[in-house]
């Protein structure tokens, strides 16, 4: 079992994600590597696939995460969570935050939720999942603090967008902060 003094490698090239994780678990360090990212609506499947490929290049213990935003206006008729989901990175690269907001406006449905799945591999044979989910609304882009879709997402628990909050406040009310806090609590039990 991992103890809180043993370093954990967070597989990411995203410095902002690393800052959020290290604000909760300071003994995490990053390793940037190119990992194949399968196209799946199942976030646990995406995370497990990344972990499998990361473990081929570095030793456990490692963590990998995947984050999504689901817009109610783009959910399927059968109620399946809406787009962009885990494809949000490519949505933002293609259309940006302003257009994400405008899509919600066109449907007159601003409701959305953010979700993060953190996968923790304490060894080469085990993957544990920790999830965080935050409900809120898509709003006109504001803020200068966050990254990605933080500028258009206002959690129900906050009066402003995630992009308007400093790191210490953002991790208290975003989905990644919730998931990483669950991982921290698990590690500290050991």
Per-region residue spans from a language model:
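Anionic-ligand binding patches
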Residues: 2-9, 16-190
